[in-house]
Amino acid sequence: MRESEFRALLEVDDRHWWYRGRRRVLAAQLDRLAVPRGAAILDAGCGSGRTMDELSRLGPVSGFDLNPVGVEAARLRGHADVRAAAVEDIPHDDGSFELITCLDVLEHTPDDVRSLRELRRVACPGGVLVATVPAYQSLWSDHDEANHHYRRYRRSSLRRAAAAAGWDPVSFTYFNSILLPPAAALRLAQRTTRHRRQAPPHSQLHLTPHRIDRLLEAPMRLEAALIRLGIRLPAGLSLLAVLRNPVGGGQGDARPGAGERLPDPAASSL
């Protein structure tokens, strides 16, 4: 991602409806995981550290980001253990974390299986990864190019990548679902006129007037409530996966709700 685009994202991280909505969805999923108090947590690709603020209520949080601007921003928020690193080479020991969050990072990596394998390395046995990614390659747009994405995902493609890296699937749900139809129509219209434009691709994340911002956030409030109840949404602009690091190399149970709890660090042998 270009530094100019990254700085723009940092500026809207606190205030944009999309980031607030994604944090709500994450919080809803973490409620279902019943994160034990004191769990060691890693935010992979932590950006400004805003998500680390929320995660720190659950336990000690470490973070890393490839962009030094994000690392500095997270440190300025008071997070001491934030490092400059790539998801393909995480600067932590094997089995260090009960919970790992990886929000809209995998699409930036040329080899997502390698990245998922490295994330699994630093997860403890039974540890959980919560990852979000953009959905549907057919929705590829200037926004993806501006942010140097390699791909968008379907549930099946993310599940295959996770399995290849050794993760057991726990649950998958799409989100940002209500806005999918208008967003798809808009991107189709943009694609049909793209050949007429000479401007470079640019991010579509920008601040909107307060009332519009709140209106756009409202659907994700509803979706977060549904996810908290265990309801999985069949389509959306984004996809959330919960994956578990196998204990003893066995295969996990992918039935609805199976495995949606973290190991208790007080009972762990780590």
Language-model-detected regions and their locations in the chain:
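A short glycine-rich, Lys/Arg-flanked "PGG" loop and its adjoining helix->strand segment in the class I
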Residues: 113-128
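C-terminal lobe and adjacent flexible extensions of AdoMet/dcAdoMet transferase-like proteins
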Residues: 219-256, 260-270
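Conserved S-adenosyl-L-methionine
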Residues: 167-177
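Conserved N-terminal segment of class I S-adenosyl-L-methionine
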Residues: 1-95, 99-103, 114-116, 210, ...
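Residues lining the SAM
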Residues: 103-106, 132
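C-terminal helical/coil "lid" or tail adjacent to the Rossmann-like core of SAM-dependent
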Residues: 182-218
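Short, glycine-/aromatic-enriched active-site segment of Class I SAM-dependent methyltransferases
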Residues: 11-13, 129-151, 155-163
